[in-house]
Amino acid sequence: MENREPAVLVEGLYKAYGDTRALDGLDMTVERGTVHAILGPNGAGKTTLVRTLATLLRVQRGRVEVDGIDVAARPRDVRRRIGLLGQHAALDEELSGRQNLELFGRLHHLGGRRAAARAGELLERFGLADTGKRPVSGYSGGMRRRLDLAASLIVDPAVLFLDEPTTGLDPRGRTEVWESVRSLVGAGTTVLLTTQYLEEADQLADLISVVDGGRVIAEGTADRLKGLVGGDRLDVVVANPGRLAEAAAVLGRLFGGSGAFDLDQLVKFDQSPGEGERPRRISLPVADRRGALARAVRALDAEGIEAEDLAVRRPTLDEVFLRLTGSPAESPADAAGAPAPPAAGVPAAPGTT
């Protein structure tokens, strides 16, 4: 019979370091077989939440269950059902990929034969079978992260916590990890992901929770969150910056009815102009994207205004994040004072239960 209870349930979770509230009555539900992403600015409480769920920090106040088990009452049972991948690879550079996985297996009391068999399964699963005998020191960043991910799965966890899993990787390495995460979820694993890359949440997450001040301030699919900051927008780059205000008035009348837009609100400063150059890009909301480009081109042409580029786009998660939290997502750090996580796949140290 299918288990209908959530993979992770958090109600009223509170955690403080002295006078600093890292988590302040946080509520969250993670459904089984999904990727649930957590976004938040530096110090929002993301890593504190993950460490609490993974039994690395005690529950001060609130209800926390993982795979139906109370984290505060039965932390050892929780550890048997979870995997944790921290922000930094936890691998022995001098050992081979296979030796690393077998080591993690023995640390989890699998025994020699079971550890060797599981290592072989995971190397094959993550496309590392051909390089399993090579020292990890010769692995690329993406290969190391995939091996680290494999290590976190040594006990075949029901729930996997990924804390900034692709920090420091190049685009190719990130893509490799994304593909691995998708395959895990396809096989039934539940993934709770914290990330500083909004594209990562957009690519992977079934549901996204935006955390700020130790609370969930918004939650939904990527499309729903984008809808919170408005609908489609028309971006226009004019060839002559001296006609920017005129272009804004023309497009304002076309899409806004009166043209009574505040130019400062429409101007989007381009990242490409050199120092001292005037802005040439404007962005304004459009109620209906159908035919918007053609209408804009005709209106600008009628006034003799040349546009170098026009595009209709959806809001980005970056804009959602900035609107909701007032700060950009740029730092992988979290609330100060929380202890560092252990190596991937390694049981929590004594004293954390």
Q: What is the predicted role of each segment?
A:
Residues 295-306:
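Extended Gly/Ser/Thr-rich low-complexity repeat segments
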